[in-house]
Amino acid sequence: MEYKNTLLMPKTEFPMRGNLPKREPAMQEKWAEMNIYEKVQEHTKGRPLFVLHDGPPYANGDIHMGHALNKVLKDFIVRYKSMTGFCAPYVPGWDTHGLPIEQALTNKGVKRKEMTVAEFRKLCAEYAYEQVERQREQFKRLGVRADWDNPYITLEPAYEAQQIKVFGDMAKKGYIYKGQKPVYWSPTSESALAEAEIEYQDKKSASIYVAFPVKDGKNVLEGDEKYIIWTTTPWTLPANLGISVHPELEYAIVKVNDEKYIIASELFETVAKTLEWENAEVVKTVKGSELEYTVAKHPFYDRDSLVMLGDHVTTDAGTGCVHTAPGHGEDDFVVGKKYGLEVLCPVDDKGVLTEEAPGFEGLFYDKANKPITEKLEEVGALLKLTFITHSYPHDWRTKKPIIFRATAQWFASIEAFRKELLEAVAETKWVPAWGETRLHNMVRDRGDWCISRQRAWGVPIPVFYAENGDPIITDETINHVADLFREHGSNVWFEREAKDLLPEGFTHPGSPNGEFRKETDIMDVWFDSGSSHQAVLEERDDLQRPADLYLEGSDQYRGWFNSSLSTAVAVTGKAPYKGVLSHGFVLDGEGRKMSKSIGNIVVPKKIMDQLGGDILRLWVSSVDYQSDVRISDDILKQVAEVYRKIRNTFRFLLGNLDDFKPSENTVAVAELREVDRYMLVKLNDLITKVKEAYETYDFAAVYHAIHNFCTIDLSSFYLDFAKDILYIEGANHEDRRAIQTVLYDVLVALTKLVTPILPHTADEVWPYIPGVTEESVQLTDMPEAVQLDDAEALKTKWDAFMTLRDDVLKALEVARNEKVIGKSLNASITLYPTAEMKAMLESINEDLKQLFIVSEYKLGGMMEEAPADAPKYEHTAVVVAQATGETCERCWVVSETIGKDAEHETLCERCATVVKENYVK
C-alpha cells in the first residue's frame, strides 16, 4: 500500500502565485460586468449614509504616487463603511479649469492668439476630458470602487451653474466686492494668484540700505536727519510714498561723522555693524508715535514720503523704518489707505515698469534693480548694497518669482464672516489634531480672497457693467446666467454679447441707452472646487451636506479645505464637512522629494504592471500616512513578502477545507478542544482590533495585526501543529473536524477583514470558500467578534502556555545546532517548569507532544530539580534528547510502536489504526 495516498494533504485550485498584474484586470472586468458599485449601493440601501467627499484631482497627466496614496486611503474607508452598517456612496471628481491646461495646449502648439476665446476654450475642454479619461482608467486599475460612470467634473454645465449660484449667494450677502488692492501677481502667468497657488523657493536678491532726507521735522526733528530704510526689492522704490514706524518703538537719532540718521534704538548695534559705522553716537531718542506726519523726501523723485504709524513694523530685520509702497504690499496698502495715500503701482501685467516710474520705464522689474541701485548711489542715498538668499514666493505652476501688485480685482470678503469660519473650524473633527490649529491660524490671519483671474479657461465672473461703470449682480441676472450655463455651458459667456446674456427686457438706471458690457475675468479655480459642496453634495440625491469626511494631502489646508470652508460658511453658515483627515507626501526611500532631476520618481503604473494593485494598496496600509511616507523598490519588496505570507495563509486554509462542508461538519463551540477555542479567542481579538483600527483610520494597525496573526498565531503555532491532525487522522476524526471548524471561521473572517485593503485578492479567495453564497465578498459585512464565555480564562492559561512554548522552541533550536537532533520530531523533551507553569501544564488535556511538535514529552520535577547541565529559561528548564524508537513512514513521529501491527510494519500504532479504519476495505 502507498501510505502517502492515505494522507489528507491540502487540495485547492486557489493559485499559489498571485500573478496580480494579469489577474487583477480580469477581476476588474468581472466587477464591471456585475456592476459591483451599483450592487453594493443596492445591498446597503436604507442604511445610514456615510459620505466621503472626493477632493477633485487636477485633470492633467498620469496619476502620481500622491494621487495613488490619496485614492487608496479613501477606498479603504468607503469599503470598510459599506461593510459595517452604512451606505457609503463614493462619487469621484475632477478639477478641470485653470492655467496648466492652457499651458499644455500651448506646449502642443495651439496658437492661442489666432482663435477666439470660445474656440480656445473648446480645445481646453476637449483636452480636460481626455485627461479625465486617462486618469479614470488609472484609478480603476488601483481597484478603487466608485461611481466611475457618473463622476463630477467642474467644467460640466450643471456644476458651473451651481458655482454661479454660490457666487450669487455670496454677492447677495455683501461678501463679494471689487477693489484696487495688492495681490500676488505672476508676471509669467500674467494673472493674480491665490495664496494656495504660491510656493516658496530660495531666491538671490539685492539687500540695500537707503537714506531718505527729512523735509519737514514737525518740531520733533531738526530737519537735517535722514531716515534709513532697508529693502530687498529696489524695483519698488519708484512706488514709494511713505515710511512706516512703530508707534511703541523708541527711535534713535544717530550721529555718524557729519550725518544724522534715524533708526530703531534696539537695532542700533546691528545697523552700525552692517553699515560699518565708527564713532557713531546716539544724540537723541524719540518715540515712534512722535514721528507721525513728519515728512521725508523721496531719494530720486521730487516728491514726499510721509512718515506713518504701523503695527506691522518689527525689529526682526532692517532698521525699524519701513519703506512703504501702497501699490506693492498688503501692509503698505492698509497703512497707506489709513493715511489717504494713492495706490501707485508703476508695473504692468507683464512685470514691466511703466511711465509712472520715470527713468526706468520699459524695464522688467527684476532687471530694474540694478539701474535703480545705481541711481541711488549717484544721488548719495545708497548706504549699503549686499546680496542675500532668502525664501521668496513663486508661482506654483511656472516656478518663477511673483510680485505684489495692486490691480482691480474681485474679492470675497473673509473679514465679513471670519468669526463664523473660526467657529466652523472648532466644530469639525480633525485628524491629525494639529489640523485644527493649522486651519484656524490660516483663517484667522488670511486677508480677503482674491477670486478673479485674468485668464481664458475658467468659469466667468457673472458680473455686468452699466454704462456708468456700475457693476450689476442681482438675483435676476445671477439666476439667468446660471440657467444659461446649465443649458449651454459657460462658453456661452464668450460666444454672446452682454445684452444677450441678460434677461429679456433687462433695464438698469446706470444704462439709459440699454448698453451693457460683461466682466472678462474668470474665477480662481479654488472657487470651482470649493463650490463642490453645493454642486455635488447638495445636488446629488445619493449624497448629503455636510459630508462626513474630506480626506486630502496636507497641502489642502490652504487649498481645498480652506476654499470649501469659505464658500460653505458664506452660503450655509456651516462647514461642508464633519471631519477632515489629512495625509503627508510621498518621498523616495531616502526621504527625498521626488523630482525628475534626481530621477527618483516612482510611478503607480509601473508598480501595478510589475507587482499589482494590491501590493501598492498593501504598501499604503503599511505606512504612517499622516506624516510624509517613503517608497522604494526595497520597501515594496518587503511589502510583497508580507503579501505572499497572507496569500499563502489563504491557500493553506483553503487547501485544508477542501473536504469540509460547513452545514454538515461544523463542530459546536462547546465541543471544541481548549486549544481550538483559544484560537477562536485569538480570532475574536483580531476582529475587534482590526475593526477598531479601521474605525480610527489607523490602517497600519490593520496591516500589522493581520500580518502578525498570519505569521505568529497561525503559521508558527496553530497551523504548524494542526498538520499532524489534518493530514494524518481520518477525514471525520473529531479533532480534525474541530480544527477545520476553527480554520473555516478564520478563513471567512480574514477574507472579510482584508477586503478594504486587498479587494482583488479577497474576491479571488471568496468563491473558493465552501458554502458561501454571495457573489462577492464586497456584498457581505465585517465579521462580528463572538465572545466565548471562558475567553479570559482561556487567554490567561494559553498565553502562559505560549510563553513556555517559546522556551521549549529555544531549547530545540540549541539542540539542533549542537546536532543532538535533526528536526523537532526527532526529539524527546523533559520539562522542569516553575510551579505556576507546572500546574498549567498538568491542567492541559491535549496531546502536549503534538503541540510542541516532538515525538516524546515528559514532565519532570520542578525547575530546581533539573539536571545541572539542562538549559534553563525563564519558565522552564528543558532536557532535549533523541526520541527512542523508529520513525513512522506515514506521520514521521519517532515511536516504539512501529511494526506492532504486523500488517503495517513501518507504521506506528496510531497510523496503523487510521489506515485500517479508513483505507483498508
From Swiss-Prot:
A motif ('KMSKS' region) lies at residues 593-597. InterPro entries: aa-tRNA-synth_I_CS, aa-tRNA-synth_Ia, Anticodon_Ile_BEm, Ile-tRNA-ligase, Ile-tRNA-ligase_type1, Ile-tRNA_ligase, M/V/L/I-tRNA-synth_anticd-bd, Rossmann-like_a/b/a_fold. It catalyses: tRNA(Ile) + L-isoleucine + ATP = L-isoleucyl-tRNA(Ile) + AMP + diphosphate. Zn(2+) binds at residues 888, 891, 908, 911. It is an enzyme of class 6 (ligase). L-isoleucyl-5'-AMP binds at residue 552. Pfam families: Anticodon_1, tRNA-synt_1, zf-FPG_IleRS. Binds 1 zinc ion per subunit. Keywords: Aminoacyl-tRNA synthetase, ATP-binding, Cytoplasm, Ligase, Metal-binding, Nucleotide-binding, Protein biosynthesis, Zinc. A motif ('HIGH' region) lies at residues 57-67. It is found in: Cytoplasm. One of its GO terms (molecular function) is aminoacyl-tRNA deacylase activity. Its EC number is 6.1.1.5. HAMAP family: Ile_tRNA_synth_type1 (MF_02002). IleRS has two distinct active sites: one for aminoacylation and one for editing. The misactivated valine is translocated from the active site to the editing site, which sterically excludes the correctly activated isoleucine. The single editing site contains two valyl binding pockets, one specific for each substrate (Val-AMP or Val-tRNA(Ile)). Catalyzes the attachment of isoleucine to tRNA(Ile). As IleRS can inadvertently accommodate and process structurally similar amino acids such as valine, to avoid such errors it has two additional distinct tRNA(Ile)-dependent editing activities. One activity is designated as 'pretransfer' editing and involves the hydrolysis of activated Val-AMP. The other activity is designated 'posttransfer' editing and involves deacylation of mischarged Val-tRNA(Ile). This is Isoleucine--tRNA ligase 1. It comes from Bacillus thuringiensis subsp. konkukian (strain 97-27).
